[in-house]
Design a protein with these regions (language model features):
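Acidic, surface-exposed loops and disordered segments
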Residues: 1-226
């Protein structure tokens, strides 16, 4: 797979596969920069952008990620691994740059900015009291990772979202083992595919899409209810 810039979103979604093996070829800097730029266009709660990406290309650091994933080949073979981190304290920090950018572009009014600042504090405090702050932050980081997968596919790169790893080890490898306010959301190896992966198929829409209410019965491929 090589750069295919200009493909449609639909084509990127349908052609993306999860690759376990990669060529040793480095990713051109401009290609990686493009993927990162598009990734950071992902939406986030209150636009606080409480997610960070650690770009890991050093072989020794990737070896640490390989160990943290139980010896899976992706982090070792891929020239780059993106580690998506969720920042649970994003709402507590100074977000005036976010407000300034939205004000300057005309996206947010002064009234909306004032309301958002107050509402976000109340909302996040409620999450904290219910023990949901981590879960909420991880969602934002995973949304960004989804954007990264599509951006990588558009640029002709292969990738594979990884959710099987030891978080304590991953945090130590990327230097945040002392940060209780940061959680690991996802690992995403990137590179040029060394294998062809065929589409394994998906269940029909009728078995996964529900209207108005969730139903416990499933429709098989023949249309029968089971």
């Amino acid at each position: 797979m090589r750069p295919s810039e200009g493909i449609s979103v639909s084509d990127a979604i349908r052609s993306r596969r999860s690759h376990r093996h990669y060529l040793p070829d480095p990713i051109p800097t401009h290609t990686l920069d493009r993927v990162l730029e598009l990734t950071l266009e992902a939406p986030s709660a209150w636009n606080y952008q409480g997610r960070s990406i650690v770009v890991v290309s050093d072989p020794d650091v990737r070896a640490g990620l390989e160990a943290a994933t139980g010896g899976q080949p992706h982090p070792r073979e891929a020239p780059v691994v993106l580690v998506f981190l969720a920042e649970m304290d994003a709402w507590r920090r100074d977000n005036h740059d976010v407000f300034h950018s939205a004000r300057r572009s005309g996206a947010w009014s002064e009234q909306f900015i004032a309301g958002s600042a107050e509402s976000s504090r109340t909302f996040q405090q409620d999450l904290l009291e219910r023990g949901l702050e981590r879960e909420y932050a991880v969602k934002d980081a995973v949304i960004a990772a989804s954007f990264a997968m599509l951006a990588a596919t558009e640029q002709g790169l292969a990738c594979s979202p990884m959710n099987g790893w030891d978080e304590t080890q991953v945090k130590k490898v990327v230097g945040v083992d002392d940060r209780t306010d940061i959680a690991v959301a996802l690992l995403l190896p990137l590179g040029f595919a060394a294998e062809e992966r065929r589409h394994p198929g998906r269940r029909p829409v009728s078995s996964s899409v529900h209207y108005q209410h969730y139903r416990t019965t499933l429709t098989d491929t023949s249309g029968r209810i089971s």
